[in-house]
């Protein structure tokens, strides 16, 4: 099924590129065009010497995939603030502030999940359990239930995997933090940087059920389990209530080429071709110059966007941002 969806999303990208009269992606012309529109956000360059195949590969969320059961509505009884930032609400949970880097791999579906899961384990243990959950374990061991690894996957499958098989700890590339740190290096977005070049190539690493040398406990004993996984309705208030009560969530949306140029403000699509689906972590909301927004963490390193974060228009299901919200709860007995 996912092969069909992946093919369809590729076709979408191709047809939209053919029919587009827009400026070349990542071009100065596109930056200038967006900034002349006087919209709610500012454009600039985040990627300099990268191949477009790499950028398309980053968009590895297969939209409209399998759905998790929807949780019961509870927002009606809640008084929600005008703005909310999980980083400030739970300051003793450092993963909420963290931005990771998925490298040359379409693993955003895994990153959005493990980032929000890490946050929630800390939040629901009242700060007692601080763990970077392993994107490597999710990416390499989930298998076909999650899609196709670096070639794209389903956020819903990721949360389901957490409840069924659990996830070990694992930090950033070369961090030697946790049982299974990420094995794909960050690649170079800039002209004269020191990281390897960004390409659209890259196979999914193998599933290894062994922790890296010197780490204990064992792989089996390092697993953190979810006790539930669910989707949240596309109702704006329900999504806000979920984040307010339980912590950051994973979402996914359609990326157009103008989004790649985001620097600050509240993103809304202005111009450019559809690149694919992208999964992210939503950690709050607010209003900027009368424009309501979601506060979102990306997985394209801290030199992208606003130190790795961005804001996107809230309340209008813009680019589908409110249609694919998934989350879950950690098992209390682990704490």
From Swiss-Prot:
Glycosylated residues, chain numbering: 192
Modified residues (N6-acetyllysine): 220
Record SMART domains: Pept_C1
Compartment list: Lysosome; Melanosome; Secreted, Extracellular space; Apical cell membrane
Record's keyword terms, sorted: Acetylation, Cell membrane, Disulfide bond, Glycoprotein, Hydrolase, Lysosome, Membrane, Protease, Secreted, Signal, Thiol protease, Zymogen
CDD domains: Peptidase_C1A_CathepsinB
Source organism, top-level taxon: Eukaryota
Proregion positions: 20-79, 333-335
Bridged cysteine pairs (disulfide): 93-122, 105-150, 141-207, 142-146, 179-211, 187-198
GO BP term (any one): proteolysis involved in protein catabolic process
Subunit structure: Dimer of a heavy chain and a light chain cross-linked by a disulfide bond. Interacts with SRPX2. Directly interacts with SHKBP1.
Record-given protein name: Cathepsin B
